[in-house]
């Protein structure tokens, strides 16, 4: 059995070397005393079988064996269709992946250079090397291609990156404190690049265009909502101004009513005093009438009692004098009350005039403030309209 099989090449699939080859280097490189041992080892290695028979006994785990199976092929993972001798032909999926990879690397050269400086291999260089290795597989030995490909990991299908996931982690961390406008400027893509991407990857171009339209719609909704809120604020402010004016008018009316009420109270007091005076006068007149009746009815006996008549006259005159003094005092009181009323009326008129002046000044000040606010709002609206026209024009141009 061993004699029928041809001996395996000593150096891993290469033709038998000369005595000065690599496999005989043990005899030459070793010391002089150990030449026979080296020849014996080379002879034993040459007699080893390619597929030794399996022994029944303790079996090692597969993880300890470093041999590769014979049926292993990397052509399906790399997208190669056909045999290696027919030449490398890539599938449509790998072409689309390579084109998307090329576009991504054109857009983000800065991130690729930073990763290359750190020591990580870029995606394009790795794929180019694998393409060169698979392309030269038609002329070279398949075992060499397997060994060269085994050194690197497999190339798997790479999904196209979206606009949100195309940024590196470092860029995201650095741009975290920046405004939204800078991020939108980084993410935005020109119309020419969109046209090129539509030719290469129409699905991605449609997705980007739909995202832009949705963002524009959301911005329009926000602006409309802001306009509605501003209008509501303006209406509420106008209502507040009108209510404040009405309140000032009501305060004026209440002040006038309080003044009139005070005047009416003073008039009532004077009327009561006059009523008391008239009552006293009526009583005095009644007494005089009674005295006159007594005098007219007792003329005859008066001649007899002359002394009593003289005493009655003296009493009557004394009563008249007392009544006159009372009337004079009451008239003096009335004059004082009238003067006090006039003074109070003058003071009230002055106070009303001052209050009216103050209210007019306040009303003028409020009107000036309202005019200033309206001017500021008009300026803000003009600025916002100008800012809105610019992106709408840019969208139309796009």
Swiss-Prot record:
Localization terms from the record = Nucleus
> Which portions of the chain have biased composition (kind: Polar residues)?
125-148
Q: Name one Pfam family in it.
A: bZIP_1
Biased-composition ranges for Pro residues? 7-19
The bZIP domain sits at 201-264
Q: Quick one: a GO cellular component term?
A: cytosol
Task: Give the protein's biological function.
Answer: Putative transcription factor with an activatory role.
Query: InterPro entries per the record?
Result: bZIP, bZIP_RF2, bZIP_sf
This chain's protein is named: Probable transcription factor PosF21
Residues covered by region (Basic motif): 203-224
- Disulfide linkage: none
Q: Say if the entry is tagged with keyword Nucleus.
A: yes
* Keywords annotated in UniProt: Activator, DNA-binding, Nucleus, Transcription, Transcription regulation
Q: Which domain of life is it from?
A: Eukaryota
One Gene Ontology molecular-function label: DNA-binding transcription factor activity
* Source organism (scientific name): Arabidopsis thaliana (Mouse-ear cress)
């Amino acid at each position: 059995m061993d004699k029928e099989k041809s001996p395996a090449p000593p150096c891993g699939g290469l033709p038998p070397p000369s005595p000065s080859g690599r496999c005989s280097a043990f005899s030459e490189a070793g010391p002089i005393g150990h030449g026979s041992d080296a020849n014996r080892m080379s002879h034993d290695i040459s007699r080893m079988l390619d597929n030794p028979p399996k022994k029944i006994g303790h079996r090692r785990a597969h993880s300890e064996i470093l041999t590769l199976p014979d049926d292993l092929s990397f052509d399906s993972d790399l997208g190669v269709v056909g045999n290696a001798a027919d030449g490398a032909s890539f599938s449509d999926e790998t072409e689309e992946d390579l084109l998307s990879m090329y576009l991504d690397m054109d857009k983000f050269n800065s991130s690729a250079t930073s990763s290359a400086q750190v020591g990580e291999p870029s995606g394009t260089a790795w794929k180019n090397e694998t393409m060169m290795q698979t392309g030269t597989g038609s002329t070279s030995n398949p075992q060499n291609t397997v060994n060269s490909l085994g050194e690197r990991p497999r190339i798997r299908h790479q999904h196209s990156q979206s606009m949100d996931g195309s940024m590196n982690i470092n860029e995201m961390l650095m741009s975290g404190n920046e405004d939204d406008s800078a991020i939108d400027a980084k993410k935005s893509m020109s119309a020419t690049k969109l046209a090129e991407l539509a030719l290469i990857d129409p699905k991605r171009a449609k997705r980007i265009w739909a995202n832009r339209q949705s963002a524009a719609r959301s911005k329009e909704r926000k602006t409309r909502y802001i306009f509605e809120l501003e209008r509501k604020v303006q209406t509420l402010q106008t209502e507040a101004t009108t209510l404040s004016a009405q309140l000032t008018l009501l305060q004026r009316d209440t002040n006038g009513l309080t003044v009139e009420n005070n005047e009416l109270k003073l008039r009532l007091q004077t009327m009561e005093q006059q009523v008391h005076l008239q009552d006293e006068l009526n009583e005095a007149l009644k007494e005089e009438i009674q005295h006159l009746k007594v005098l007219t009815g007792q003329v005859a006996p008066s001649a007899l009692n002359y002394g009593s008549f003289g005493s009655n006259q003296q009493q009557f005159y004394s009563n008249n004098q007392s009544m006159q003094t009372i009337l004079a005092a009451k008239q003096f009181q009335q004059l004082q009350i009238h003067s006090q009323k006039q003074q109070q009326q003058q003071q009230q008129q002055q106070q009303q005039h001052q209050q009216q002046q103050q209210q007019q000044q306040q009303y003028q000040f409020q009107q000036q403030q309202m005019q200033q606010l309206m001017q500021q709002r008009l300026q803000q609206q003009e600025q916002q309209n100008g800012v809105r026209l610019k992106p709408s024009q840019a969208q139309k141009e796009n």
